[in-house]
Amino acid sequence: VPMPELPGLSALLVQGGDERIALQGESGQNKYGVSPAPRAGLVEFSSSTASHISAEAWAAVDAFRQRMHEERSDGPEHERALWQREARRIRTTFCTTWGLEAAQMSWHLHRSGTDAHAMASALSLRKFGRPYRIVMGEACETGSKVAQALLEGSRQQGRLMAELSEIAIRGEDGACRSAQAIDQDFLRVVTQSLAEDVPVMVVRVDESKSGCCYPSQALVQQIAAGSPQHTSVLVDCSQLRCEAQVLQDYLARQYLVVLTGSKFYGAPAFCGALLGGADWAAVWPQDLPDVDAHGRPNFGVLARWEAALCAMQRYQQLPDEVRHEWLACFEEALTQRVAASSSLSLLDALRDGRSGPRSLFALRCRDSGGQRSLSPAEVERVYRRLNQMQPQQAQEYVYAIGQPVPCMGADGQRSQYLRLSLSAPMLLMLAQMPQAQGRAWLRARIDGVVGGLEEEIALLGQSDR
């Protein structure tokens, strides 16, 4: 029986996802407001959540699909072998791009970062062989399903083998607690658990939804060195905004690392992986193909990784000073523009000693008079109106920003923050421009998106347009 045709390019890029990337109705978009094809005329500061695929990555995925179409033959065994061969190629390319030794690293592709968290928890259970405690920061700073995935990963014979402790990252006014206080809370829970002979899995986040890094690397290293047989460290690096040296260091220290190619690097959503240092090889499961309900390999996850690698390779080849220059330009333009706003302000972020420019910022929202924090519903309305604007409604450009995240306002009222972030594809585009032209373009686009947010906030309370 001939093998079924591979789906078309757009369908391939959503293959193997869940309701989060399923295309909805006539819009042809997923719940993030993103379609699985390039979209011209859209300026996306939304890489903290999801972005449209770039034209360059689209072409790379098209070439991958054509190659898979030509190489697939009759029989599921051949198809599975082809999937595994391509997964190995992706791993090798990733390692070369990031300066990693493939032989010293365990690796597993996942449909999402959430799935990768579940596997990390399952590996910790294999290491400990008994019930354990997971210690992480507050769930709203990371993926919406991460906490549940960590618990589900501990399930054995129908029973959850892990308990979860969450540490507060922000206070009642939405501002970050001190790094010292957060570290102390992590250490207190870890110390108490180990004293009770309960192993501990510590989750470090690099970066969170608001750009935070916690607990400190110094504390994580102290915990791991103090009781290596009874602790494991998972680094949630889903945003993947760190430098290559940081990723290399995590793996050299034998941490587990969750990452995705679908945030900073602009691949379609559901493009995850779990990495582990060489010490994890003893408990690492056999790397089998990701299959659907009929047992057929999911080539969609490979296609999405093909898109991610397209940007990763080009970005990592840029000189450090070029990357730094455009990140600094983004940070300077955004901080200056928001400082001039009466309805927007930057939310603080824990950086754990990092002094370089940032690519992700969270924005608090107030009414136009600056008197009160916007309610969660008001922030949602501002987000929806800006992200759903059509070209004919805009002067020249249409913008996309990151999804709202629950947070307390400075006045102690429940609110949400919005996010603006620079992506690798946008930085690569800027790097191809003459410097003065690129800086002017970026400043104008930041002025445009912040101005659009201010306009939508001013319209709150007025009748629908």
What are these language model-derived features?
Residues 108-298:
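Conserved PLP-enzyme active-site core in the AAT-like
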Residues 5-24, 31, 57-115, 123-130, ...:
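Conserved N-terminal alpha-helix of the aminotransferase class I/II PLP-enzyme fold
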Residues 315-326, 330-415, 464-465:
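Conserved small-domain helix->loop->beta segment predominantly found in fold-type I
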Residues 262-357, 460:
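Active-site C-terminal subdomain of aminotransferase-like
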Residues 40-80, 84, 136, 162-197:
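Low-complexity, highly charged intrinsically disordered N-terminal segments
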Residues 1, 407-465:
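PLP-dependent enzyme catalytic core of the Aspartate aminotransferase-like
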Residues 1-31, 394, 398-400, 409-415, ...:
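Intrinsically disordered, low-structural-confidence terminal and linker regions
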Residues 2-17, 67-76, 142-169, 282-295, ...:
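Extended charged low-complexity segments that act as oligomerization/scaffolding linkers
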